[in-house]
Regions:
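Short beta-strand segments enriched in hydrophobic/aromatic residues
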Residues: 62-63, 121-123, 150
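Bacterial N-terminal signal peptides that target proteins for export
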Residues: 1-10
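Hydrophobic pocket/interface hotspot
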Residues: 46, 58-59, 66, 78, ...
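Bacterial N-terminal signal peptides
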Residues: 9-20
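Short beta-strand edge/turn micro-motifs at domain boundaries
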Residues: 129-159
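Surface-exposed, charged secondary-structure patches
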Residues: 83-129
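Short, low-complexity N-terminal intrinsically disordered segments enriched in polar/charged residues
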Residues: 23-60, 64, 157
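A short gly/proline-enriched turn/hairpin at secondary-structure junctions
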Residues: 67-77, 91-96
Length: 159
């Protein structure tokens, strides 16, 4: 039953995200691009903005040709699409988003301009912490690309 509920929720979120960009595109004003002085500052800004669900700060990190690689080969390309992705992420949990989730970096290694980062996510609405890893590719003070293991379907929500 819980698995069916999770599946239904995931499908509803995906359906909402597939329609939402068309509805929000006309009203979505992308923030100015804002560079950071070091790769570490790029990562720190991303994690802090993500934890605060600060959409403007999140999207300000990504250049026009940025990419986010999700599970199952899904690639989100460009600032507008990335903005739409984070708009869905930053909704309240009751609206299908994850506002209030907190990512804590457990270990991070910088290789060139790329971080291999292990993190744990927790939130008042999660039944247990969720662990994952991301690769954050920085370039010229921006978040050029991200590859994530994050799987919203694997989150265990409180009942």
């Amino acid at each position: 039953m819980q698995r069916r509920w999770k599946y239904s929720c995931i499908m509803a979120i995906l359906a909402t995200l597939s329609v939402t960009p068309h509805l929000q595109a006309a009203e979505m004003q992308l923030p100015d691009i804002r560079t950071q002085p070091t790769p570490q500052a790029v990562l720190d800004e991303h994690i802090d903005a993500l934890n605060k669900c600060d959409w403007n700060r999140l999207v300000a990190q990504y250049p026009e040709d940025a990419q986010i690689h999700l599970l199952n080969g899904t690639i989100i390309t460009g600032r507008k699409a990335i903005g739409e992705l984070f708009a869905g992420f930053c909704k309240d949990p009751k609206d299908g988003g994850l506002n209030g989730i907190n990512f804590k970096v457990i270990q991070s290694t910088l290789i060139g301009g790329t971080f291999a980062t292990h993190w744990v996510a927790s939130a008042p609405f999660l039944a247990e912490p969720y662990k994952g890893s991301d690769a954050y590719i920085t370039k010229d003070g921006l978040m050029q690309a991200m590859v994530t293991t994050f799987d919203g379907a694997a989150l265990k929500m409180k009942k």
